[in-house]
Amino acid sequence: MNFMACGMGQNKQYEEQSKKIQDLMKNIKYKIAVMSGKGGVGKSTVAANVAIGLSKKGYKVGLLDVDIHGPSIAGILGIRDAAIEFNEERMVPYPYSENLKVLSMQCLLNQPDDPIIWRGPAKIGVVRQFLSDSEWGELDYLIIDTPPGTGDEPLTVAQTVNGCRALLVTTPQEISLADVRKSIHFCKRVDLPILGLVENMSGFICPTCHTLHNIFQSGGGKKTAADFDIAFLGSLPIDPNVVISGDSGQSIAADSPVNAALDQVLENMITQLKSK
């Protein structure tokens, strides 16, 4: 076997796929990777509701879930049983609403509880295939939900999607802030611009009296953003109804106090993007 010829062939395919990705990304104005240093901070819930919120403002939005081992976007949006259609060899994202399309690994599984037992090269290949073989069309925003940490999936997005920016999600506790600091250093090392930081689970809204109680220490996200000279996009409180909505596949209710906080995050995010 001619190993050199084989390697050259693989390099050519890789380069062709990279060009294909860049050509497709030219049709998308803003690309945003939603990242967190650790799991359990509500990153996917933030990603889903940012996408929904932008779509309700009239923007054309795509939501791509590249959390290969723990995809949850389809569950949050209530489309676990939605099958991804194919146009020849291209994936057609699920039309969640008039302005929002969704693509998740979860929609490609035969059974929702099937585990995905893959090593790095397979995951990298699938993320690149999601980016190269999906029919998004023209979008204002592509929101990319990445798994927590600084592993293969966020690294692949950072190195592959030109013009991508990171939206970092943390909670107020120091254990989460320590990990989001690692994410900040990751972004700096791979030259991924940081759009801003969101502090999630910032206080608890009592379902009875509707007042905000700081069950964790608060303000850590804002201080971290200031320490690293990045934009602080806002705080999102805990509302038990948001958990119920997510488990039942619904977005944040219009009358939830979280909705107003989310809208402020969106406005800050849009302002940041327009200022770049």
Model-derived features with residue positions:
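Walker A/P-loop phosphate-binding motif and the immediately C-terminal alpha-helix
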Residues: 31-68, 184
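Residue-level signature of catalytic and energy-coupling elements of molecular machines
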Residues: 28, 39, 65, 73, ...
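Phosphate-binding/switch loop-helix module in NTP-utilizing enzymes
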Residues: 109-157
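Conserved Switch II/interswitch segment of TRAFAC-class P-loop GTPases
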Residues: 137-144, 150, 162-183
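Extreme N-terminal, non-catalytic leader segments
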Residues: 1-41, 82
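C-terminal lobe/tail of nucleotide-utilizing enzymes
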Residues: 1-19, 186-276
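Glycine-rich phosphate-binding loops of nucleotide-dependent enzymes
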Residues: 103, 127, 146, 159, ...
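Phosphate-binding loop that captures ATP/GTP phosphates
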Residues: 60-62, 66-110, 117, 124, ...
